[in-house]
Amino acid sequence: MWEMANIREQCSWVHSNKEEATKKALALIRGAIGKVKHHKPIGTIEIHVNRNILVVGAGIAGMHASLELADKGFHVYLVEKEASIGGNMTRLGRTFPTDDCSMCTVSPIMNKVNSHPNIELLTLSEVVETSGRPGDYKVVVEIRPRYVNPDKCTGCGLCTEKCPISIPSKYNLGLDKTKAIHIPFDSCVPNIAVIESDVCLKLTKN
């Protein structure tokens, strides 16, 4: 049981007459003591807590958060809307203030995330619905298809060479071209090709 007599804001800070402020403070204390006599103990309750954790966004911050949690034994679902993790840091050449190679910094982190037994990667995915309560949320995640079998793709890039359709590169923000089926970028994670379904001849014709 607890009750606060706020003698700082209501006495000390607002009155210049110390004697009268002291009388008021004593009255507030007596009132708080009298009130707490009528309080009922809150007690304690136990609630179920889901120890699985969802991290939305697999940029540098999301990856670090996932690794910290996974290393502490939590199972982490890492949701990323793009085909690869890494975020905008994978697009940078150098990083301030150390002028380090950006990919040299982020690539080991990406691989560590991908190989961590407590992290489940969900790429091409977005959260579409949440429900539940603190400690026990339920989340619906929409996963878009790659149209490539991840168990068979080796990331060799031969499919990209054979594809006849050229499109602006999403990774390079349209500054160059890629193919309708492509590896998002060098050293991407997961290193699996993805097909742009809106321009692929096979998918659009069927």
Listing of model-derived features with the role each one plays in the protein:
Residues 59-61, 84, 158:
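Residue-level detector of alpha-helix initiation sites
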Residues 1-7, 40-45, 82-108, 122-152, ...:
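Non-heme iron-sulfur electron-transfer modules
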Residues 77, 155-162:
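C-type cytochrome heme c attachment motif
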Residues 52-78:
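N-terminal Rossmann-like FAD-binding beta1-loop-alpha1 element of flavoenzymes
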Residues 34-51:
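A short, basic/flexible loop-to-alpha-helix module at the beginning of a structural domain
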Residues 112-120:
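A structural motif corresponding to the C-terminal end of an alpha-helix
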Residues 17:
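C-terminal boundary of histidine-terminating zinc-finger modules
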